[in-house]
Amino acid sequence: MIFSTATAVSHPNIAFIKYWGNTDDALRLPQNGSISMNLAELTTRTMVTFDSSLPRDIFDLNGVRQSGPSLERVSQHLNLIRGIRGFSVPAHILSESNFPVGAGLASSAAAFAALTVAAVRTAGMEMSEKDLSRLARRGSGSAARSIPPGYVEWLPGSSDIDSYAVSIAPPEHWPLTDCIAIVEDAHKKTGSSEGHLLARTSPLQSARVADAGRRIDLCRNAIQKKDFDLLSQLIELDSNLLHAVAFTSNPPITYWLPQTLVLMQAVK
């Protein structure tokens, strides 16, 4: 018997000041706050159906039946929502994205934001934007930023209660366009979850985190004043800092490809 069904649409977000490393891996509490912009043209549409006739959760992603870690991660997140609602009905999840998954475009952020909203609706619950952001964070840290609209700041907090994202400016405040160059659409060899774990092994991570608050204040101010020169400088600096941490982690992570460097030089 179908218990209920609902659909939600979410968007990935591109971080200006990035999230990298946790103080609590289970709760996905970040070591530093972050600021991002939601990408309106990229979408993830997810339908969740709780169906008591199912033997277990079923997850279809872009028409492909999922198993292993992908299914397990989705089921674990649904268990949080089922636990809040107080039932254990299996679910069928249908999710489709119009952009590459696992290629550095925050696909997990959009996926878990959409999954959270759809599952909460399907379970017949109502939640505030703050609580949806908190809950989405448990599935993927960056998903907290895909709940509020427009330009978003993730407040790092120190517990599950106070780590969530808020909108600092609506989309129409500053109609920026993010130009995305996909140099490879294959899945990253090292996922972000593993990257967050390895961040603490880099001797550069503590310095990156220590200066994050200053960069966040400058970034927030740049958005409010629509100062593109300042914003672009901050974005490049913060990106380089993150990749420096990745390069110096143990084992090292290299997300840049030869084509990446060619594009970086061309833009300069």
Outline where the language-model segments fall.
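ATP-binding N-lobe of GHMP and related small-molecule kinases
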Residues: 1-103, 117-129
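Generic, low-specificity signal for short hydrophobic/alpha-helical stretches with a mild N-terminal bias
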Residues: 2, 17, 28, 56, ...
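Alpha-helical scaffold segments in soluble metabolic enzymes
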Residues: 15-18, 76, 114-118, 218-221, ...
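Short alpha-helix boundary/capping segments
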Residues: 66-69, 106-107, 204-207
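Catalytic-loop motifs flanking and including active-site residues across diverse enzymes
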Residues: 70, 107, 111-112, 211, ...
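Gly/Ser-rich oxyanion-binding loop with an adjacent helix/lid
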Residues: 83-173
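ATP-dependent small-molecule kinase catalytic core of the GHMP/sugar-kinase superfamily
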Residues: 131-268
